[in-house]
Amino acid sequence: MKPDPRSTHFNAAGEVHMVDVTGKDITVREAVASARIHMSADAAEAIRRGDTKKGDVLAVARLAGIAGAKWTSHLIPLCHAIPIEAVSIDFDWVDESDSDDDAVANQTLRCTATARTTAKTGIEMESLTAASTAALTVYDMLKSVDRAMVIDQVRLESKSGGKSGDFRRDTGDKA
């Protein structure tokens, strides 16, 4: 099902409002989002060694991502507070060996957040917030090593459940 081009956050008078979900069915929902952090070889090595001044970068980022999912409705004004029944945060190094710059290869960390609920509305924003928060935490913990890190490609990878149906990003989609 294609998304409706009209925003559901505006009423007939054009005023902002929170969408009324009282009439919707409770369904099992899952969303997967990801973010990438490009960093210097020194920053990547610090993560791999696990010996940064602030502690285990990935463990702290994982906790921050989970907390981010739980706080989404406080951060995004029109998000519903939904029961978050599961959140997982995974990290993997992206092989960018096809990059024109050999120094960039294997210095990109991908954070993937998966969130699940049984609710009347989706959990996409929670998974996006989790991935973003985890990536920001990696930046915070390594900024003394590399202030030029770049966070990009914060995006929804897939979602399932609900009236609008399932979504899965095309693997060839660069955006």
UniProtKB/Swiss-Prot annotation:
MF (Gene Ontology): cyclic pyranopterin monophosphate synthase activity
Query: Which principal EC class is assigned to this enzyme?
Result: lyase
Residues the record lists as binding substrate:
78-80, 125-126
- CDD domains reported in the protein's UniProt record: MoaC_PE (cd01420)
Role according to the record: Catalyzes the conversion of (8S)-3',8-cyclo-7,8-dihydroguanosine 5'-triphosphate to cyclic pyranopterin monophosphate (cPMP).
**Family of this protein:** Belongs to the MoaC family.
The name this protein goes by in its record: Cyclic pyranopterin monophosphate synthase
Q: Which organism is it from?
A: Rhodopirellula baltica (strain DSM 10527 / NCIMB 13988 / SH1)
